[in-house]
Regions:
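Long, low-complexity intrinsically disordered regions
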Residues: 2-297, 302-305, 310, 317-336, ...
Length: 405
C-alpha cells in the first residue's frame, strides 16, 4: 500500500452539526489510521503500539487461510512487518493480554480492571459444565496448584480424575481440561502466558502475569463502561450509539448513559450524518482529511468493518464472511477480503495462501458497481505483491476468473 497523507482539518471544533456520508467515511478512516502513510523504514514496536493504542484492541482469529486476522489488521496500516513483534508485545513484554473484549481479543494490559465486570459474569460453558465444577472441586484446586507449582500449562498437559471421561461430547471446547481452563480464564483466575506453536494457549495465574497496579485495581461498572465507550469513540471517530456499544460488546441500554456523560463533558458531540437514522456521535479529536489515499486489503475482523451494518452505512458495501457457509451457498468465496482504495471499498478478493507451493492465490476478484477498474487494478496488483512478500510467498497467481465484474 502506498498512502499519501492528505492535508487534514480538525472538525471537532467546528460548529456545524451535519456531515455528508463522504465526510463521515473519511472521519472514520482517519480515526482508524488509514489516512496516514505506512512507515517508510523498518517497522518496530513503537509503530505497533501506536496502532494498538489508536484501535484499543485487536480481535484474535487464528484461521490461517491467508494469515491470522490480528496480524493482518496491523499489516493493513503498517505494511510488511515482523509478526513476531506482536507476539513479543503480548507474550514477552506483556504489554497486551488476551481477554474477552469485542470477541476474543488482545487488549492493552491497562484495560484489565475495566473488563472486570465482564469476567464476573463470564458464562460457564458448555451447558451443564457447572455440575462438573461442583462435583470435582478438588480437581479444580489441583489444577490451580499444578499451575502454581509447574508454571504455565495448556489443556494437553492436564490429566483427568480417575473414571472421568476427558472428552466433552458436542462441545467446541472438546475436552474437560480445555473447558476448565477456559472457565478459569474467563473469570480472570488465569491469564494466557503464551501461545505454543500449535496456537494452543498455556495459562498461568493472572496475578503472575498482570502487573499489580492493574490486577489489584478496581473500577466501578460505570467508570469501566465510560472508558470503553471513550476508546470506541476515539477509534471510530464518528459512530452511532450501537456502533459504540458493539466495540466492546456492551448493551446499547448500558452504553447510552455513558455516551450522554461523554457528551456532557465535551468529549463527544451529537451530530447528524447524511442517510443515518438517529443521532451520531463525533469524538472531539476526530479529523476530516481532505482525501484518503489508501490501498489495502482489509481483514474480515478489522474494526473498520467488523460491524457489518456500520460497513454498509459508511461504504454502501454489503459484506458477509462466508467461510462457514457451504461452498454451494457462497456468493463471493471462502475467505474474501474487501479492498480499500482511496476512501471506498471497491472490490472483494477471494484469497488463499498456498504455502506448500509459495503462492498467494487470488481465486476471484469481484468489483463493486461503478468501480474504475483501470484505476484500481494496478493498485490491487501492487498490494497483492506486497502482501505475498510479507507472507514470504514467491508469487501471486490470479485465477482466470479473478477479474470479474
Amino acid at each position: 500500500m502506498r498512502v499519501r497523507a492528505g492535508r487534514v482539518a480538525t472538525i471537532g471544533r467546528v460548529s456545524r452539526d451535519h456531515l455528508s456520508i463522504a465526510e463521515a467515511r473519511r472521519v472514520a478512516l482517519a480515526a482508524q489510521g488509514f489516512d496516514r502513510p505506512r512507515p517508510g523504514g523498518r517497522v518496530d514496536l513503537r509503530h505497533l503500539r501506536a496502532v494498538i493504542g489508536r484501535l484499543g484492541l485487536l480481535q484474535l482469529d487464528f484461521v490461517n487461510v491467508v494469515v491470522p486476522a490480528h496480524y493482518q489488521v496491523l499489516y493493513s496500516r503498517l505494511g510488511p512487518y515482523r509478526m513476531s513483534l506482536l507476539d513479543k508485545l503480548a507474550y514477552h513484554r506483556r504489554e497486551l493480554t488476551e481477554q474477552w473484549a469485542h470477541e476474543a481479543s488482545l487488549v492493552p494490559v491497562e484495560l484489565w480492571p475495566h473488563l472486570g465486570h465482564r469476567r464476573e459474569v463470564h458464562p460457564i460453558r458448555p451447558r451443564g459444565f457447572d455440575s462438573f465444577l461442583d462435583q470435582h472441586s478438588g480437581y479444580v484446586d489441583w489444577v490451580l496448584e499444578e499451575i502454581g507449582r509447574r508454571g504455565p500449562l495448556a489443556a494437553e498437559d492436564l490429566p483427568m480424575p480417575d473414571g472421568v471421561s476427558r472428552h466433552l461430547e458436542g462441545s467446541w471446547l472438546g475436552t474437560v481440561p480445555r473447558a476448565l481452563l477456559e472457565h478459569l480464564f474467563g473469570r480472570g483466575v488465569l491469564a494466557v502466558a503464551e501461545r505454543r506453536p500449535s496456537m494452543a494457549r498455556a495459562f498461568d495465574r493472572s496475578e503472575h502475569l498482570i502487573p499489580l497496579e492493574h490486577h489489584g485495581r478496581t473500577v466501578t461498572r460505570d467508570e469501566a463502561q465510560r472508558e470503553l465507550i471513550r476508546i470506541a469513540a476515539r477509534a471510530h471517530g464518528i459512530a452511532t450509539a450501537a456502533d459504540l456499544a458493539d466495540y466492546f460488546r456492551l448493551r446499547v441500554g448500558e452504553a447510552k448513559p455513558r455516551i450522554a456523560e461523554l457528551v456532557e463533558n465535551g468529549e463527544l458531540r451529537e451530530i447528524e450524518v447524511e442517510g443515518w437514522r438517529g443521532s451520531a456521535y463525533l469524538h472531539r479529536d476526530a479529523r476530516l482529511p481532505r482525501r484518503v489515499d489508501a490501498a489495502t486489503l482489509v481483514s474480515p475482523f478489522d474494526p473498520l468493518i467488523w460491524t457489518r451494518k456500520r460497513t454498509e452505512r459508511l461504504f454502501g458495501f454489503d459484506y458477509r464472511f462466508e467461510i462457514f457457509i457451504p461452498r454451494e451457498q457462497r456468493r463471493w468465496g471462502c475467505y474474501v477480503l474487501p479492498f480499500l482504495h482511496g476512501d471506498r471499498l471497491v472490490a472483494r478478493v477471494d484469497l488463499k495462501a498456498d504455502r506448500a507451493n509459495g503462492r498467494l492465490l487470488a481465486l476471484a476478484t469481484h468489483y463493486e458497481p461503478g468501480t474504475d477498474r483501470a484505476e484500481v487494478e494496478p493498485a490491487l496488483n501492487t498490494e497483492l505483491e506486497t502482501m505475498a512478500a510479507w507472507l514470504e510467498l514467491e508469487t501471486v497467481v490470479r485465477s482466470a476468473n479473478a477479474s470479474l465484474s
